[in-house]
């Protein structure tokens, strides 16, 4: 009698192999690894997606206004071109009699959930689901994650949100793209995000075209030690040249007296930990990197080097359960240019506060921070080092 097994579905081969290593699945096959307890397989990103309009009938074969809007009663799924081989492997494994349950180990986020659920739906697999939810792919994180697997039902709403996003993109994008193309007899495209972004660009362009600059004037008094700027009740800018000249005439030949000098200490707070958007913004401003370049670099630092946590986060905060790991994370980055700062922090003790630790402000994933994985800076490319440096300096600053 065959032993019951758990099938683990990862999003990419590299992560699947990392998980297989931790679970000691050494029996390598084409597209999966297994042992007497687990089968670890993987997608290649999306293996399954929403079917094109042509799948809903002949009337959608040709682009014309008569067939619009396209509003399928039930959205169909299809295996993506080039993914058929791996889908067949995964589908076959899901159907094996000894596989009694599934662990979804795709990226811990909305799209990762969709990758796995669409595969399960297409394969008509209704076996019990558990979820591996981790923010880094180090051996330690994977091992801890398997000790704390969550019921798949907890993520049903996340799947529904991803499904709504995908179906919304299909309905808006394909209908409007066909309508525009047919109406204007030109290859035009539209989309839920694309069209909204284009509108923002158009509005900005119109504002620039219609902007009418207004001159203003300042009055400066230069001394050997410093420069004084005249300031009235409404600020230092004077809209009228005539008014500026009148003020200047009144001050000519007069002496200024410094009546008081006050010094006040100011405390500047850290800008906070990085989420993906702010990291992309800073990488563009400082290094000229596009958002896609930054994300690709972050994926390598997360998946290949395993030295930063999950990149696709929209939170700048940590949860309380991360706090006990901060000391170990600091010790891991106590190298090279960061050693002195880490030493000072550890000497004074780690103090957390609501400015960066707040469970209520973390939904799927906490802010981007270093993992407990040992770092070898020499193994990083120039661009990887730049992004890593930004994240570590932010981490140290809080």
Language-model-detected regions and their locations in the chain:
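Short, conserved phosphate-binding/catalytic loop or strand-edge motifs used
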Residues: 135-142, 276-277, 297-308, 312
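Short, polar/flexible loop-turn hinges at active-site or ligand-entry regions and domain interfaces
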Residues: 75-79, 106, 126-130, 151-158, ...
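Hydrophobic (often cysteine-bearing) scaffold residues that line and stabilize catalytic clefts
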Residues: 15, 111-115, 160, 164, ...
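Long, highly charged, low-complexity internal segments
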Residues: 39, 47-81, 92, 188-303, ...
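Catalytic phosphate-handling regions of large nucleic-acid enzymes and associated NTPases
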Residues: 5, 101, 302-331, 353-375
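C-terminal or mid-to-C-terminal helical accessory/interaction module adjacent to the motor/catalytic core
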Residues: 75, 85-91, 97, 117, ...
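Active-site phosphate-binding and catalytic loops of NTP-dependent enzymes
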Residues: 27-32, 127, 152-157, 178-182, ...
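Intrinsically disordered, low-complexity regulatory segments
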Residues: 1-166, 170, 351
């Amino acid at each position: 009698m065959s032993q019951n097994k758990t099938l683990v579905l990862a999003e990419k081969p590299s992560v699947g192999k990392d998980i297989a290593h931790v679970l000691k699945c050494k029996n390598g096959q084409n597209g999966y690894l297994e042992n007497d307890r687990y089968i670890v397989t993987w997608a290649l990103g999306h293996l399954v997606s929403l079917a094109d309009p042509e799948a809903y009938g002949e009337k959608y074969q040709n682009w014309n206004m008569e067939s619009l809007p396209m509003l399928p009663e039930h959205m169909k799924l299809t295996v993506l071109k080039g993914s058929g081989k791996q889908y067949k492997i995964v589908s076959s494994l899901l159907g094996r009699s000894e596989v009694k349950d599934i662990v979804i180990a795709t990226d811990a986020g909305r799209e990762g959930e969709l990758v796995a659920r669409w595969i399960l739906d297409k394969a008509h697999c209704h076996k019990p689901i558990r979820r591996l939810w981790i923010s880094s792919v180090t051996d330690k994180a994977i091992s801890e994650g398997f000790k704390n697997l969550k019921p798949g039902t907890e993520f049903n709403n996340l799947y529904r949100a991803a499904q709504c996003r995908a179906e919304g993109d299909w309905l808006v994008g394909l209908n409007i793209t066909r309508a525009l193309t047919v109406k204007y007899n030109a290859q035009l495209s539209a989309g839920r995000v694309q069209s909204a972004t284009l509108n923002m660009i158009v509005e900005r362009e119109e504002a620039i075209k219609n902007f009418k600059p207004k001159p203003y004037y300042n009055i400066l008094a230069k001394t050997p030690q410093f420069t004084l700027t005249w300031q009235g009740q409404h600020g230092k800018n004077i809209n009228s040249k005539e008014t500026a000249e009148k003020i200047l005439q009144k001050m000519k030949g007069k002496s200024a007296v410094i009546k008081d000098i006050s010094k006040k200490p100011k405390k500047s707070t850290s800008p906070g930990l990085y989420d993906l958007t702010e990291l992309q913004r800073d990488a563009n401003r400082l290094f000229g990197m596009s958002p896609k370049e930054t994300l690709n670099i972050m994926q390598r630092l997360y998946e290949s080097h395993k030295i930063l946590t999950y990149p696709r986060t929209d939170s700048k905060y940590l949860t309380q359960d991360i706090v006990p790991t901060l000391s170990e994370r600091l010790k891991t980055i106590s190298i090279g240019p960061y050693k002195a700062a880490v030493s000072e922090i550890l000497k004074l003790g780690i103090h957390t506060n609501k400015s960066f630790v707040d469970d209520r402000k973390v939904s799927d994933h906490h802010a981007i921070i270093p993992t407990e994985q040992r770092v070898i800076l020499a193994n990083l490319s120039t661009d990887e080092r730049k992004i890593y440096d930004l994240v570590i300096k932010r981490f140290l600053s809080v």
